[in-house]
Amino acid sequence: MCQGALFLFNGGQPESRKNVQAVFWKQGNNPPFHFISCAEGNSGSRMRAGIVVDGKGQSRIWGDRIVIDWKEEAEKTYGFRVDVLRRGRGSWILETDLGLRLLKEYRGSVNRLEFEEAVLQSLDGMETLKADQYVRNSEGELLSTAEDGTRYIVKEWFADRECDLKDEREVLSAVRALALLHRQFRMIKRQETWNMRSMISLPLFEAMRRHNRELKKARTFIRGKRKKNEFELRVIGNFEIFAAQAVEAERGMEKLYEIHGKEIADGYAVCHGEPDYHHILIGNGYTAVTEFNQMHLGVQMEDLYYFLRKIMEKHDWNERLGRQVMESYERVLPVSEVERQGLYYLFLYPEKYWKQINFYYNANKAWVPAKSTEKIRKLEAQQEARESFIQTVIQGV
């Protein structure tokens, strides 16, 4: 009997090996598979799975539970030959006769896919900047449906590694790629069909206002607790400092929109939406930007803020590196005075602080993970360096 790997999914929620074994053993099956990750189906639902044996798919049906052979499914639907099938991050990586491909479940709309494809095709053919282009199936469709009803997409993929935020040369290459991406996206003519809610960004101060309300609710809750843990005590101790920055950022951003609203709206361009280092791959002579599922029309400075903040958190708000990042970006795409002001208020807003408190407030408040407490400690420790960076690098450049 062969040894393989069984993956079961139902909303991506992990379940114990014991529960999954019970499902199959109850039906008289004794598959010799090695369990890597799994999920138990809800009552009345059908369980979806994929089996890998020596890099190739195997299809089975146990009772009413369909097990999809993704190798066979991809070959049948897309017409290429799959030589190797392996797991990726929430996806399948396919080594095909046409090159590397990524297969992933998709839950959005076809209109959304068409929006992303139209934008990404503007990057097709560029030598130093690449993107994970969508691959249409044999019927010319972007979206495919497997036997069990799973909707999925296939994209071109890359074997390159993720950007190393500890490597300054790679960081500067990555931010240059982001600037090239933004410059190319500004050339794209907006289409009338790009009017879905997920495609257009709301004014940036609206999210700040919502987050500030959430901060106040969480602080009120913590104040009312008699016995407080370390996380809660630290929040009580540092809340006024971070809250003051949050309010100043919201008011400043709203005023910026009041004065320059038309200029900001006219300057809306396509944004990546989540330019994380996981989504920037360093290739041989090129940089690949991937995972555009958060792409939208909005303020591109939000992308730059997101990526630069991640870099600075890793480098303890190193001002020298921060200046180099800004210079690398502006050598490709200069930043206007209004954009710089918006970037200032984005950095002034204590987003990481809000995230930790919001996570606490919406989770099990009786037990706070040690990791959350450590993150609050780190935010406190980095606060002085963060403020200096904002004043000298962002506001003072």
What do these predicted ranges mean?
Residues 152-165, 217-224, 349-367:
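A glycine-centered beta->alpha junction motif in the catalytic cores
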Residues 99-196:
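ATP-binding pocket architecture of kinase catalytic cores
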Residues 354-397:
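ATP/Mg2+ or Mg2+-diphosphate-binding catalytic cores
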Residues 104, 194-270:
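ATP-dependent phospho-/nucleotidyl transfer catalytic cores
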Residues 301-334, 347-367:
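Active-site activation/catalytic loop segments of kinase-like enzymes and analogous catalytic loops
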Residues 70-95:
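ATP-binding glycine-rich phosphate-binding loop
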Residues 91-93, 134, 251-301:
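Active-site acidic catalytic loop and adjacent metal/ATP-binding pocket
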Residues 54-78:
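Juxta-kinase regulatory segment immediately upstream of eukaryotic protein kinase catalytic domains
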